[in-house]
């Protein structure tokens, strides 16, 4: 198939989103083999090419129409959109959906000895960051002036190195901040991974493939968020038991052989079934309670 007819999806070459992005696509039935020495991986069973690139290149590739889709952190997407708007370059794309991985937050942090009250405490100080546009937007909204120190990595060492008074960096657990004598003060942006599409018109066949991939992604994400619940229940407490099942659709109720006083309940729950809920179910006479993961869902 000509390259122009193949769907091009950009993903992070290496880093926190790379493995999860490839896992997601494989869960959607896209088969491919990655050669670490090559930036392009061709799907074995679908007209799809994966471009493995730097994460901060992905938004621009999608916005310029070089690739058709991309999986990227919302923080990187927003940073690039602000920069492109400033430079009067193409800055639009279609955000298809958030994904269930890559959660992090962009936060301000200061040295442990810093007497921090609120963001105004940073007035006139130097802040190191890899996200100058998101930081600038936040500080402008607060009416705070500051000096920025642009770094591409190792932002957390800037205060100790005498490069800045504070930092604005991505935080997942806070362990890196603690190891560098810093503490988090303000969250300025919450982020997850998301999947985006070029806003340029697509040929019908390619758009149909995009829609198919998105439908499968929706099914994979729904399955991760859901559990399949099976249990036996007395008919006299059936309504109470069904009411306890968290986020469940209308369950399937089936008779049990040789037991007219009990039924089998099959249900899909979109919320966690906690131990205390299971104990309540048991008190109502439920037995043989099974809670199982779901691999795929559709419809």
Curated annotation (Swiss-Prot):
Keyword Nucleotide-binding assigned: yes
Protein location: Cytoplasm
Regulation: Feedback inhibited by histidine.
UniProt main location, coarse: cytoplasm
UniProt record, GO biological process: L-histidine biosynthetic process
Cofactor(s) this protein requires: Mg(2+)
GO molecular function, one term: ATP phosphoribosyltransferase activity
Keywords for the protein's UniProt record, in alphabetical order: Amino-acid biosynthesis, ATP-binding, Cytoplasm, Glycosyltransferase, Histidine biosynthesis, Magnesium, Metal-binding, Nucleotide-binding, Transferase
Gene3D superfamilies documented for this protein: 3.30.70.120, Periplasmic binding protein-like II
Reaction(s) this enzyme catalyzes, per UniProt: 1-(5-phospho-beta-D-ribosyl)-ATP + diphosphate = 5-phospho-alpha-D-ribose 1-diphosphate + ATP
Pathway connected to this protein: Amino-acid biosynthesis; L-histidine biosynthesis; L-histidine from 5-phospho-alpha-D-ribose 1-diphosphate: step 1/9
SUPFAM superfamilies: GlnB-like (SSF54913), Periplasmic binding protein-like II (SSF53850)
Keyword Protein transport (UniProt): no
Enzyme class: transferase
InterPro entries registered for this protein in UniProt: ATP-PRT_HisG_long, ATP_PRibTrfase_cat, ATP_PRibTrfase_CS, ATP_PRibTrfase_HisG, HisG_C, N-reg_PII-like_a/b, N-reg_PII/ATP_PRibTrfase_C
EC number(s) per entry: 2.4.2.17
GO cellular component assignments: cytoplasm
HAMAP family linked to this entry: HisG_Long (MF_00079)
Function according to Swiss-Prot or TrEMBL: Catalyzes the condensation of ATP and 5-phosphoribose 1-diphosphate to form N'-(5'-phosphoribosyl)-ATP (PR-ATP). Has a crucial role in the pathway because the rate of histidine biosynthesis seems to be controlled primarily by regulation of HisG enzymatic activity.
UniProt similarity note: Belongs to the ATP phosphoribosyltransferase family. Long subfamily.
Protein name: ATP phosphoribosyltransferase
Organism this protein belongs to: Shewanella sediminis (strain HAW-EB3)
Organism taxonomic ancestry: Bacteria, Pseudomonadati, Pseudomonadota, Gammaproteobacteria, Alteromonadales
């Amino acid at each position: 198939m000509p390259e122009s007819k193949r769907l091009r999806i950009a993903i992070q070459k290496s880093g926190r989103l790379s493995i999860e992005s490839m896992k997601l696509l494989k869960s959607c039935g896209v088969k491919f083999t990655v050669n670490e020495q090559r930036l392009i991986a061709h799907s074995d069973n679908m007209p799809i090419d994966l471009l493995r690139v730097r994460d901060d290149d992905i938004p621009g590739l999608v916005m310029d129409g070089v690739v058709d889709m991309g999986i990227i952190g919302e923080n990187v997407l927003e940073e690039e959109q602000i920069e492109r708007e400033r430079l009067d370059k193409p800055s639009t794309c279609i955000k298809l959906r958030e994904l269930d991985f890559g959660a992090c937050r962009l936060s301000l942090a200061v040295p442990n000895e810093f007497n921090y009250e609120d963001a105004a405490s940073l007035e006139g100080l130097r802040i190191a960051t890899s996200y100058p546009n998101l930081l600038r937007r936040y500080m402008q909204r607060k009416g705070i002036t500051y000096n920025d120190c642009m770094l591409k990595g190792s932002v957390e060492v800037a205060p100790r190195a005498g490069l800045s008074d504070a930092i604005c960096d991505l935080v997942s657990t806070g362990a890196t901040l603690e190891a560098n004598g810093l503490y988090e003060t303000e969250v300025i942006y919450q982020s997850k991974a998301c999947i985006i599409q070029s806003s340029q018109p697509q040929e019908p066949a390619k758009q149909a493939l995009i829609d198919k991939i998105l439908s499968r992604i929706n099914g994979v994400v729904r399955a991760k968020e859901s559990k399949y619940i099976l249990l036996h229940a007395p008919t006299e407490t059936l309504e109470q038991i069904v009411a306890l099942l968290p986020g469940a659709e209308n369950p399937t109720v089936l008779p049990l052989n040789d037991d007219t006083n009990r039924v089998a309940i099959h249900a899909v729950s979109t919320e966690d079934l906690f131990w205390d809920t299971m104990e309540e179910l048991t008190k109502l006479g439920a037995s043989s309670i099974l809670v199982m993961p779901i691999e795929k869902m559709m419809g």
